[in-house]
Amino acid sequence: MSKTLALTEELIALSSVTPEDKGCQSRLIELLEPLGFVCETIESDGVTNLWARKGTTQPLLVFAGHTDVVPTGPLEQWTSPPFVPTQREGKLYGRGAADMKTSIAAMVVAAEEFVQAHPAHKGSIGFLITSDEEGPATDGTVIVCNALKARGEQLDYCVVGEPTSSDVLGDTIKNGRRGSMSGKLTVKGIQGHIAYPQLARNPIHQCAPALAELVAEKWDDGNEYYLPTSWQVSNIHGGAGASNVIPGNVVIDFNFRFCTASTVDGLQKRVHAILDKHGLEYDLKWSISGHPFLTPKGTLSDAMSDAIKSETGVTTELSTTGGTSDGRFIAQICPQVVEFGPPNGSIHKIDEHIEVRFIDPLKNIYRRTMENLLL
């Protein structure tokens, strides 16, 4: 069994459902310290974070990831227990197999091979690992980034081990992500008997034309890196639970996934303008979980693309699609951030898995990326 596969199985066996780490990071420290990494545990409100660094010079290449996993869902629906790593028909099954314990194992073993083969390499190598990526993400990577910024540690490159590949290992690198902004809109009416609408004001009827306009609005055209900004309603809550009562208010939850062609302020102003145009009495609360970030084609993306091509023969595509990730926090302190990892078709699903044939090539791609940047 390869060292990367063995470490992946070790990590899967630790049931680190967010925000628990369950000893994953302690195991990583055991492997990193003998290589010369100075390891620091940073805890915040029940979340365990690891910052490890070898070297004190630039450039600093950081590998980032998360040891927490999403809940398993119904155990009886799993073909094998989610925290008992199991190989069947060329696949390794277990919660975290794809998202993202294989990536973490591959990064650590790649660093071990690189350091042992090139003890006099230039620059520094870092690891930023958290147990709060799948949860609120308020006490994880963002806490470490703030600490690093406060003490003046400069990151030059960061590779986040998110499962970015689509069909085969290496077909997709994420070189950016869209921002995410949510709104909770409460439209106020006047409750009353449904037989006497003249004595009430139905907020559902009132907001319908405004919602139709928001749905039809073209927010921007996107750009060469991003799809156009999208606006989606996720929930509508209204009614008193009876069929003969006009509700007093309706609550609408919506979300923007926005690109660099739009701004937070600009989108908010346009939403308010549409609501005001329709004469609604409303309250709107905004929350921003991440701003868009982008690493244009350059040193880091080229180094990783070359590593993928050399290892697999695959020509990779740069993409900014998908949800948010911890890359949004790291991009605030690091000029070049990309995400790369195994295929994502089974992530967060029952019987999550990775094809065993991809595990060592993933490790080799991470090692080749180090060679391209630090030799």
Swiss-Prot record:
Pathway: Amino-acid biosynthesis; L-lysine biosynthesis via DAP pathway; LL-2,6-diaminopimelate from (S)-tetrahydrodipicolinate (succinylase route): step 3/3. GO terms for molecular function: acetylornithine deacetylase activity; cobalt ion binding; succinyl-diaminopimelate desuccinylase activity; zinc ion binding. Signal peptide: none annotated. The active site is at 68, 133 (proton acceptor). The keyword Repressor does not apply. Disulfide bonds: none annotated. The keyword Metal-binding applies. Homodimer. Belongs to the peptidase M20A family. DapE subfamily. Its cofactor is Zn(2+); Co(2+). One of its GO terms (biological process) is L-arginine biosynthetic process. It catalyses: N-succinyl-(2S,6S)-2,6-diaminopimelate + H2O = (2S,6S)-2,6-diaminopimelate + succinate. InterPro entries: Bact_exopeptidase_dim_dom (IPR036264), DapE_proteobac (IPR005941), Peptidase_M20 (IPR002933), Peptidase_M20_dimer (IPR011650), Peptidase_M20A (IPR050072). Its EC number is 3.5.1.18. Zn(2+) 1 binds at residues 66, 99, 162. This is Succinyl-diaminopimelate desuccinylase.
